[in-house]
Amino acid sequence: ERLKTLGKSDKMQLTKKEKKTLLEYKSSASYRINELLRNHKDTDELPEQERKFVEELDSALSKMPQYEGNLIRTVDFTAFSDKNERIEKFMKEYVENETVTINQYWSMSKERGYNEDADIQIYVQSSKKGRDISSIGLDEKEVLYERKQEFCVVKTVNYNGKYFILLKER
């Protein structure tokens, strides 16, 4: 029995449509979908095509393994002329000892090394709920949180003009 399950990877449990949806999300759809999710509290408000995409992605993510370990996400507003205002607005959402709910899908990395000069670096300590999607598509060390994930803001620090946020899953 053990040999039967040994060779099965997590991505083999996905339907073709779910795998296609995950690949599409990882390429370019993430920006469009996450923007819609940020601006609409209820998926029923989304256009039908996007609503179906979200349903398919939710289904795919539910089949992916949960990642256990520490994660990092970087946020960089350097390309914007109103960089400082954007940073200030972003940081107002992260108040120590408060809960923050992420309405969109949230991509994190298992490893440091991606844009370490970013304005904001977000760390999740001892993750258990993020979905490990690194086996899908390019060899990225990506973990994706499902919609409406809640985090407790453990600590925020401004060090040499860079912000560091430590979160713990709720």
Predicted regions and their residues:
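Mono-ADP-ribosyltransferase
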Residues: 1-170
